[in-house]
Amino acid sequence: MAAKEVKFGDSGRKKMLAGVNVLADAVKATLGPKGRNVIIEKSFGAPLITKDGVSVAKEIELKDRFENMGAQLVKDVASRANDDAGDGTTTATVLAQAIVNEGLKAVAAGMNPMDLKRGIDKATIAIVAELKKLSKPCTDTKAIAQVGTISANSDHSIGDIIAEAMEKVTKDGVITVEEGSGLENELSVVEGMQFDRGYLSPYFINKPDTMVAELDSPLLLLVDKKISNIREMLPVLEAVAKAGRPLLIVAEDVEGEALATLVVNNMRGIVKVAAVKAPGFGDRRKAMLQDIAVLTGGTVISEEIGLSLETTTLEHLGNAKRVILNKENTTIIDGAGVKTDIDSRISQIRQQIGDTSSDYDKEKLQERLAKLSGGVAVIKVGAGSEVEMKEKKARVEDALHATRAAVEEGVVPGGGVALVRSLQAIEGLKGDNADQDVGIALLRRAVEAPLRQIVANSGDEPSVVVDKVKQGSGNYGYNAASGEYGDMIEMGILDPAKVTRSALQAASSIASLMITTEAMIADVPEDKPAGGGMPDMGGMGGMGGMM
C-alpha cells in the first residue's frame, strides 16, 4: 500500500480552500448574460469554447492532491445540481464557494464547525420553503421561451425554438437535440407514434421516389411471436382482403415462407400489406406492443393470453389513419384507440417512472410516455463552425433542461433576485446557540453571491446593486444585460424554481460538510527520476585484427 500524507486542521483546510477557489473562479466567470467564455484545451482537434459551468468544472484537475480534493468536492456540487435540475451548475458553484469561504473564516475564529453546519442546514430549509412560496406556475409559451432564453445566455432564437417544440409535443413529449447541417436552428416534429424499426422487405415500398411504404387507413395486426408459417395467417389475410383495406403486421419477426408470400401478395395487389419487426426486446417489446395496441384500439395476439393467429378476427386488429414505413423507422399517425384507455396507459407509465430507480429504465419509459401522449421533436442546431456547434449545442441542452424544470416546479424572478427575496424567511430565525446563529448569518451573506457575481461579470459595482435590489420588493431586480432596474418577470428574466432550489441544496449540503473537515489524507507523490537516458551499454570490446 502506498504511503499517505495526512494534513490536520487549518493546514488541510487552507489547501482545500485554495482548490475550491481555483475551480469556482474559473466557473463563475461564465455566470449571467455578460458572462465570459472559457477556452478548454482538447487532446485533439480545436479547443472547446464554452459558457457552460459544468463543462468547465469537469475539465479541472489540480496538481496538488489536497487542493484537488477541494476542487473535486465543488465539482460534485455542480454535478449534483446538473443531475437534479439539468441546469444551475454555475449558481451552485458560486454559492458553494461563498459558503466555504465564510464558513472557514468562522472556524478559524474559533466557532464550532458542527454548530455552524446545523445553522446552515436550518437556514437552507427555511429558504427552500420560501422559494416554493415565491414560485409561479409556468404554463404559457411566452414564459417558457423566456426561461429558455435566459438559460441559453440571452439567446432568443434558442428560447423561441424550445417553446415551439414544447407547444407541439406537450410537456411529456420527447425533445432531442442534434447537430444540424445549416447555419440556422431547425425544428422537426414527428406526428404520431414513431419507433425505430423499418420495413422487413424493400418490396413493400409503394412510393419509389421517397423510398417509403405508405398505407392509408390500414388495419394493424400485432403479434407477440415470430411468424414463419403462412398457413396460420391465412384466415386473417382473407378477412382483410375482403374488407379491402391495407394491413400492417407488427411481429417479433416475419421470415421465410411467410415473408415471401406477403411480398408476392403485395406485388400482385391481392392484399396491400407491409411487415415490420416489433420495437424493443424481451419484456420491453411486450410493453411497446401493448402501447401500440392501446393507441390503435387493437389487441396483441399472444399465446400468453390464449390468442392465436388462426383464431384472429378483424375485431382484434388495430386501426390508424395512416402508417409510413422507411428503411429505419415506422410512424403510426392518428391511431383509433379509445382516449380513456390511452390516458390510463399514460398514468400507468407515469407511475412506473416514479417507482424506478434506474436512469436507463426511466429514459425508456419517458420515451414510451412521449410516444403515447405528445410526440417527438428534434431541434437541429445550426452553426458556422464545429467549435461554435459544440458550444451552442451545450447551451440548447441546458436551456431545454431549464424549461422542463420551469414547467415542473414553476418560475421565480431571475438574476439572483429570488435568493435575495427569500432572505426574509431567515430574518427572525434563531439557532440553538450563538454558533448556529453564525451559521444562519453566514448563509444570509452567501445567498447574495450569485447576484454579486452577475453584476461583477457585467462590469458594475456589486455592493451598490445588491443594496438597491434589497431596498426594493417583490420582483424588483437588476437586468445585467441592459443595466436597468425593474420588474424581473415583466422584463422576461425568469429562473426555474427547481434550478434555484437544487443549486442551493447541493451547495449548502457539500459546503457545510467541507467546513466540518478536520483531517485530509492523500497519496504521497512518487519521486520519479528526471528523464534519465538509456543505461550504459558498455564498450564494443576488441574487434580483433581485421584485415
From Swiss-Prot:
Q: Where does ATP bind?
A: 30-33, 51, 87-91, 415, 479-481, 495
Recorded hits in SUPFAM superfamilies, A to Z, give: GroEL apical domain-like, GroEL equatorial domain-like, GroEL-intermediate domain like
Q: What is its main location?
A: cytoplasm
What EC number(s) does this enzyme carry? 5.6.1.7
Q: Name one Pfam family in it.
A: Cpn60_TCP1
Localization in the cell: Cytoplasm
Q: Which domain of life does the UniProt lineage start with?
A: Bacteria
Q: What are the GO cellular component annotations?
A: cytoplasm
One GO MF term attached to the UniProt entry: unfolded protein binding
First-tier enzyme category under EC: isomerase
Keywords on record: ATP-binding, Chaperone, Cytoplasm, Isomerase, Nucleotide-binding
Which BP terms from GO are recorded?
Answer: protein refolding
Known function: Together with its co-chaperonin GroES, plays an essential role in assisting protein folding. The GroEL-GroES system forms a nano-cage that allows encapsulation of the non-native substrate proteins and provides a physical environment optimized to promote and accelerate protein folding.
Q: What is this protein called?
A: Chaperonin GroEL
Phylogenetic placement of the source organism: Bacteria, Pseudomonadati, Pseudomonadota, Gammaproteobacteria, Pseudomonadales
